[in-house]
Regions:
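Membrane-interface micro-motifs in multi-pass membrane enzymes
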Residues: 108-152
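Short hydrophobic/aromatic helix or loop-helix immediately within or flanking a transmembrane segment
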Residues: 54-77, 81-85
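Membrane-interface alpha helices of multi-pass inner-membrane proteins
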Residues: 163-179
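Membrane-interface helix-boundary motifs at transmembrane edges
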Residues: 2-5, 95-106, 154-162
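Start-transfer (signal-anchor) and selected internal transmembrane alpha helices
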Residues: 1-19
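Aromatic-anchored segments of alpha-helical transmembrane domains
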Residues: 19-21, 113-121, 172-177
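Transmembrane-helix motifs of polytopic, lipid-linked glycan transferases
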Residues: 84-104, 146
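Extracytoplasmic loop-helix module adjacent to an early transmembrane segment
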Residues: 19-56, 68-69
Length: 179
């Protein structure tokens, strides 16, 4: 009976391995190009002046660049963990949107899909700096997938309605503010 209980959670193993692979990969990434631009902002101006200036240039990116500013002022290890979690959650949400059951095959497939996206677009992700690019494009992708997942669950069952609506609105706002 106990073995069957653990067998139900076997589908989670690929996601744990994915997180560890991503964390190891992030360890080799440093700051470059746009990352350095956002990193040096505190030496040049204060955050409010920067936000006002960026609003005039590209108003829809204020929220994401505000987050980017604070992430880059923190130790890089914070971004390693957050970005690895975001990519892992993208794989989990892809899995959940495709298949709601605890199926090992689909969890492996979802992780392979996520890794193939990362490694096939490695050059594009790093072209403007990994931190900047992933926060500007991958994190909103996560928000969009989260909104789709919540919408899918919300239409399927009517539990935690207020919580789902709040998370859906936040995810949609995060996704919309990315462009």
């Amino acid at each position: 009976m106990n073995i069957k209980k653990y067998k139900n959670y076997l589908f989670l193993l690929p996601f744990i391995f994915l997180f560890l692979i991503l964390l190891n990969w992030h360890h080799s990434i440093g700051l470059s190009i746009d990352d350095l631009f956002f990193y040096t902002i505190p030496q040049e101006t204060n955050i409010m002046s920067f936000v006002i200036e960026r609003y005039d240039i590209w108003s829809s990116r204020i929220l994401i660049e505000y987050i980017l500013y604070h992430i880059l002022q923190s130790p890089l290890i914070l971004w390693w963990y957050l970005d690895s979690l975001i990519f892992t959650f993208i794989a989990i949400l892809t899995y959940k949107l495709i298949n709601g059951e605890n199926n090992l095959f689909y969890s492996i497939l979802s992780c392979i899909l996520c890794l193939s996206f990362i490694f096939s677009s490695h050059y594009a992700l790093g072209s403007a700096g990994f931190v900047t690019t992933t926060i500007n494009y991958t994190w909103p992708l996560f928000s969009g997938l989260l909104a789709l997942y919540i919408l899918k669950n919300h239409t399927a069952k009517d539990i935690n309605k207020t919580k789902n609506i709040c998370i859906y609105n936040f995810s949609t706002l995060s996704y919309v503010c990315s462009k």
